[in-house]
Amino acid sequence: MMFMQQFRNLLHPAMKGARNISILAGGGTMRGFPTRNPFNTATLYSSLPTMNIFGQMQQVRWKTYGNEYQPSNRKRKRKHGFLSRIRSVNGRRVLRDRRQKGRMYLSH
């Protein structure tokens, strides 16, 4: 029934009110969709073009995520190390605050 609803959305606005596709077929044939029995929906389904519902939801991703952090001990100690903390006013403040808080490690 979900397929029927999606198919109904593709129809002309005047035809959307019809409850059954066989009514729309009007005597057994719908343009481009041959059926022997207007009430045999199995043959109507087989003659309809297949639509991949999940194909529209798939996305192609060219960007990779999660590989931004490439650890380097040299950069880490240069940025957050004890000597760099002592050199700047804000760094000395960080060391002071960590000392007051009782941290075991003041910096890297």
Swiss-Prot record:
Coiled coil: none annotated. Residues 1-20 form a transit peptide. Keywords: Mitochondrion, Ribonucleoprotein, Ribosomal protein, Transit peptide. It comes from the Eukaryota. One of its GO terms (biological process) is mitochondrial translation. The keyword RNA-binding does not apply. The keyword Ribonucleoprotein applies. Residues 68-108 are annotated as: Disordered. Belongs to the bacterial ribosomal protein bL34 family. PANTHER family: LARGE RIBOSOMAL SUBUNIT PROTEIN BL34M, MITOCHONDRIAL RIBOSOMAL PROTEIN 34 FAMILY MEMBER. Component of the mitochondrial large ribosomal subunit (mt-LSU). Mature yeast 74S mitochondrial ribosomes consist of a small (37S) and a large (54S) subunit. The 37S small subunit contains a 15S ribosomal RNA (15S mt-rRNA) and at least 32 different proteins. The 54S large subunit contains a 21S rRNA (21S mt-rRNA) and at least 45 different proteins. Component of the mitochondrial ribosome (mitoribosome), a dedicated translation machinery responsible for the synthesis of mitochondrial genome-encoded proteins, including at least some of the essential transmembrane subunits of the mitochondrial respiratory chain. The mitoribosomes are attached to the mitochondrial inner membrane and translation products are cotranslationally integrated into the membrane. This is Large ribosomal subunit protein bL34m. It comes from Schizosaccharomyces pombe (strain 972 / ATCC 24843).
